[in-house]
Swiss-Prot record:
This is Photosystem II reaction center protein H. One of the components of the core complex of photosystem II (PSII), required for its stability and/or assembly. PSII is a light-driven water:plastoquinone oxidoreductase that uses light energy to abstract electrons from H(2)O, generating O(2) and a proton gradient subsequently used for ATP formation. It consists of a core antenna complex that captures photons, and an electron transfer chain that converts photonic excitation into a charge separation. It is a single-pass membrane protein. SUPFAM superfamilies: Photosystem II 10 kDa phosphoprotein PsbH (SSF161025). It comes from Zea mays. Belongs to the PsbH family. The lineage of its organism: Eukaryota, Viridiplantae, Streptophyta, Embryophyta, Tracheophyta. InterPro entries: PSII_PsbH, PSII_PsbH_sf.
Length: 73
C-alpha cells in the first residue's frame, strides 16, 4: 500500500504567534455568508466612483478636458 499513517504524537504542533492570535477571529468567520445583500450596494458605489475617477484621468491624459493655467506638450 502506498499510503502511510502518521501518529498524532509525531506531528509537530503549529507555532503560536502574536499575529496569528490577532487574525484568528477573522478566520473563524470563513465560509459564512451574511443573509441579504450585505455590503453589495457600497461596493457598487465604490466601483462607480472609481470608474468616474478613471474616466477623468483618461480625459486629462487625452487633453479632452481643458485645464486653465496648466501647460501641456
Amino acid at each position: 500500500m502506498a499510503t502511510q499513517t502518521v501518529e498524532d504524537s509525531s506531528r509537530p504542533k503549529p507555532k503560536r504567534t502574536g499575529a496569528g492570535s490577532l487574525l484568528k477571529p477573522l478566520n473563524s468567520e470563513y465560509g459564512k455568508v451574511a443573509p441579504g445583500w450585505g455590503t453589495t450596494p457600497f461596493m457598487g458605489v465604490a466601483m462607480a466612483l472609481f470608474a468616474i475617477f478613471l474616466s477623468i484621468i483618461l480625459e486629462i491624459y487625452n487633453s479632452s478636458v481643458l485645464l486653465d493655467g496648466i501647460l501641456t506638450n
